Amino acid sequence: MNPISHVAIIMDGNGRWGIKHKNSRNLGHKEGLITVEKIIDVAINNKIKFLTLFAFSTENWKRPKKEVEYLFSLLENFLIKKIKILDRKKIKLKLIGTINFNKKLNKLLKNSEKKTKFNNSIQVNLALNYGSRSEIINSVKKILKKKMEMNENNLSMNLYTKNIPDPEILIRTGNTHRLSNFLLWQLSYTEIFFEKKLWPDFNELDFRKIITRYKKLKRNFGAL
């Protein structure tokens, strides 16, 4: 049975869900946050120690300004209302990406990370303003600046995800089959599960089924 320490998720389909139900992309983003809470609980119950959520990519800035502003306000409200619950559940928040938003959101994110830094039930990595190509380029620049040897270990240790094991599982909802510039280095040997359901429809049972499927896989990492 394959152990699971790290699951990464591309939470795709919020906007399409909102259009389908109420002709509002924003509604889909709001419902998607409810799904996030449920999935975190399943991860904790299955003793998964790391969960990385692709929340906002560097490419998402191309979306309509009002939608981007709503996404930020939604995240602000979530942190204000839920930080005590996250702390009580011993959830550690870790930010990966370039945290360069408005002053209020920047402060909330940094304070939330600081407040939960000693929690140990699960580490939830929020990928915000994140792009994997930029992450890899920045890692190479750090190695050159530090005059370190250029090798796999040093490159890994200069990524946002240093000291975090590579994901065993990647889930992408929304019936789209691509990586979208997410954890390109870290996903080298990850098992990928593409789900037809839009993110707000993805539920606890769906997640548990993927966990079960993964545990039954024979993984050989290129060997026989």
Predicted regions and their residues:
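Flexible, compositionally biased loop and terminal segments
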Residues: 1-224
